[in-house]
Each structure stands twice: as C-alpha cells, then as structure tokens.
C-alpha cells in the first residue's frame, strides 16, 4: 500500500514509519524541515515530499500528483489543522489516521480502566492542548458522518523513544542532566498513581496493523502498554539507568503542583497524579496477538543510549532548568 506520514520521524512516528516499511508499504513522508539534530535519521526507504504543511495551497500543490491508501497525520493539533486535512485528503486517501491523545478522557475517578467509550472532556473546560484535540476529533467525526471521510482516531498514552518521561519538567534532557549534576528529581504528589509508559516501538507494532484495515474506519482506539507502573517506580528506573546511586527525590504536594509555573499545562500535570490505565480490548480485536514487549527498564536504557550517541540529542533548555530550580529551592 502507498502510505503517507505527515511528520513521520518524531518521537512516536519514527517507529511507525519503520514498521510500515518493514511490512512492505511504499512509504512517503511529508515535512517542511528534514533536520535530524534531535531526531532519528529518516529511513532511507522513505520517499520525501517537502512542503510546509501549515501552508494549505503549497501542500495542495505538492500533493497534486499523489493518491494514497492511508494518510497518518502526527502533527494535527487544532480544528484549523483538522479542517485543512479534511479538504486536502478527502479525495486523496482511502483512510486517514488522526493521532489524538488519551488526555481527552475525562478524569472522573470512576470507570477505570478507561475504554474508548469513556466520557470525553468538553473542549472549553480544559487547556488548549487537550481542548484542541477534542475539537479535532469532533471535526473528523462530523466529516465521517456527513461526508464519509475515512477517519480512524488513535490515542497514544505517554509514549517515549527519543524523549525522557519525567513526572515534573519537560521531555528534553534537562531533568536527567540536573540529576547527573546532583540535583533532586521532582515527583508530583505521592507518586503512587498507576501509569502507562509505552515505548514507541511497541506502539508502532499495533498502529501499523490499523493501516489499510477497513474495520478501523470510523473507529477510535487507544494504544498503550498493558503494564502499569507508578511514577515512583519510573523515576527510580530513570535514576538507575543514569547510574545514579545517591538518589535524591522530592515529592511536591498535590495542590502545589497545580500552581507551578512549568511548561506543561496544569490539567496535564493533574492527570499525571491520577491513575492513567486503559482497557486494550478494542485494539486487540483488530490486532489480536499484540502486546507491548519493551519493559520500562529496557526502554529507558534504549532512550538514554540513543541520547548519548550525539551531543545534539541531549537538549538542555535553560528556561526549564530555571523554573525547576526555583521549585526545587522552595522545597529543599
């Protein structure tokens, strides 16, 4: 099949591109910037379409010669993006897969684990990131119902490969570097809530089975590991992977976390202090033999090893460091 990835070499999508190539698909990547300083090298088998996806007319012209069996969009973040995607691809693809987020599930303290039919947030009661994903989903569902737009919605959980999952901070190398420099690692709340930490290679193994699958049209799926770990456990695994023996950890009280001036919106921070666990029945009906195979210990080692392959991979963000330092000083 001819498959287009919009994006295609990011933290989640690189492995999806790789898996699609391994399955024998003819893979195209649409992107305006092919720099790979903090990303993995683009697989040589992928064919490149260079265009600024945010420029509708430019992208329309770039795609004019093509038709696809499936389009996988990893960089659709708001309703305008969704509306443009519908216009661009409604006559160009047999399937369009939108990468949403499990953060759209309303945290109601009941009905765990979450299923695809769990209540979703209203777009106006949450931060822009979550609200915009909700708006996108609604736009695609409406297009499916009114125009038969061939939508499949996929909601990843916390998924990592080239990023480092931390409870408080950002997904760059700033927090690991602080720990290596002897600074404490911050954990939101008590750190005992159950969470899913999914390696991108495992996500991709399920995701690629949705490509070209007619049973997935008009459906939504979340994809996460079946293994649940706490942030305390994950944080200790990170410190072990960094070979830090003199571990320093500070737990920031629940109410205080929501007041912190950090890059992550407060409602996403709130979700990181709650149980985030998911029922995988629906994806396993499509991919019956799938299960996540990479443990957090193996996955973190793979990530840290890759980060140390090049200095460019290890982004240290001064603004993040300053904000984390201010929080740390308050609780030391």
Please describe what each predicted stretch is.
Residues 3-23:
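N-terminal Rossmann NAD(P)H-binding glycine-rich loop of SDR-like oxidoreductase domains
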Residues 101-127, 138, 142-147:
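Active-site "gating" loop of Rossmann-like NAD(P)-dependent oxidoreductase/epimerase domains
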Residues 137-164:
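Conserved beta-loop-beta element that borders a ligand/cofactor-binding pocket
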Residues 161, 188-193, 221-228, 237-239, ...:
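Glycine-rich Rossmann NAD(P)(H)-binding loop
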Residues 167-175, 188-211, 218-219:
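Substrate-positioning beta->alpha
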Residues 200, 258-290, 309-312:
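Conserved C-terminal active-site "lid" loop/helix of NAD(P)H-dependent oxidoreductases
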Residues 209-268, 329-332:
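Mid/C-terminal beta-alpha module of Rossmann-like enzyme folds, strongest
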Residues 294-332:
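Amphipathic terminal alpha-helices
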């Amino acid at each position: 099949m001819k498959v287009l990835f919009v994006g295609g070499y990011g933290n989640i999508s690189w492995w999806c591109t790789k898996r699609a190539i391994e399955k024998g698909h003819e893979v195209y990547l649409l992107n305006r910037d092919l720099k790979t300083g903090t990303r993995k090298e683009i697989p040589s088998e992928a064919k490149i379409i260079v265009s600024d996806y945010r420029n509708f007319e430019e992208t329309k012209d770039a795609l004019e010669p093509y038709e696809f069996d499936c389009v996988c969009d990893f960089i659709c973040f708001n309703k305008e993006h969704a509306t443009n995607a519908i216009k661009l691809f409604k006559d160009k693809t047999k399937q369009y897969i939108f990468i949403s987020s499990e953060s759209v599930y309303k945290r109601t303290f009941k009905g765990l684990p979450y299923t695809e039919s769990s209540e979703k947030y209203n777009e106006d009661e949450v931060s822009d990131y979550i609200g915009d994903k909700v708006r996108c989903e609604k736009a695609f569902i409406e297009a499916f119902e009114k125009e038969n737009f061939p939508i499949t919605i996929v909601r990843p959980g916390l998924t990592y490969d080239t990023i480092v999952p931390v409870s408080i901070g950002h997904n760059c190398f700033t927090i690991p570097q602080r720990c290596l420099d002897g600074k404490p690692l911050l954990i939101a709340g008590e750190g005992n809530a159950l969470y899913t930490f999914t390696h991108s290679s495992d996500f991709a193994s399920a995701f690629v089975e949705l490509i070209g699958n007619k049973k997935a049209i008009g459906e939504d799926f979340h994809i996460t590991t079946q293994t649940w770990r706490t942030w305390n456990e994950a944080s200790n695994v990170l410190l072990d992977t960094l070979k830090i023996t003199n571990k320093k950890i500070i737990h920031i009280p629940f109410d205080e976390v929501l007041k912190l001036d950090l890059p992550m919106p407060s409602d996403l921070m709130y979700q990181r202090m709650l149980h985030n666990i998911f029922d995988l029945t629906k994806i396993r009906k499509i991919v019956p033999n799938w299960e996540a195979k990479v443990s957090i210990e193996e996955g973190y080692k793979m990530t840290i090893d890759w980060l140390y392959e090049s200095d460019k991979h290890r982004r240290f963000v001064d603004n993040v460091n300053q904000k984390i330092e201010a929080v740390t000083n308050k609780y030391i």
